[in-house]
Amino acid sequence: GDYIMPYLGASPDSVRNGKINYLINGDMMIDQRLEGAAYDAGDNNDDVYTLDQWIILSESNDGVDVSRDTTVPSSGAINSIKLDLEIANEMFGICQIIENKNCRDIIGQEVTLSFQAKVSNARIGDIRAYILAWDGTADSVTSDVVATWNDDANPTFATNWTAENTGADLGVGTSFAKFSVTGTIDTSSTANVAVFI
């Protein structure tokens, strides 16, 4: 099937500039559950953890096969996550929720989510990225952050989740390129932060 391949590891530039990467396993190196095998046939159902710390979210179960892959940007990366579309027109994404103790110092701050991505076929369109704030009880989050998928538009997020940036189609092409979204985590009573692509 057609696929998307994001890579969210820290770049040498971000390390040199003193920026902190709050995401765990952004370089997709760790896969304790299946040790590199594909997540499919139930392992890839909606709202299931796949590569360490990454949750697959999709309209239906078994709509997207997930695997660690060695196709990477030319930035010294070793792995990426491969999201292989199994159902035509399936809407899906990956999400990571940051624990309260690990995100306290970015609440109230402007933050940027940067990643590199490519698609196998230009017909996979409308890829968006979000920085989300959770204003419910700390670390008792709704991990399925999407309440309603909306065709070619921003999803409606689940109760207590707020997008801190405005989503827009990033125009991901068939070669790796860097994409960034920025937002201020200013939702009142934010207790957790997440990213969703």
Where are the regions that the model predicts?
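Short, Lys/Arg-enriched N-terminal segments with co-localized hydrophobic residues
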Residues: 1-4
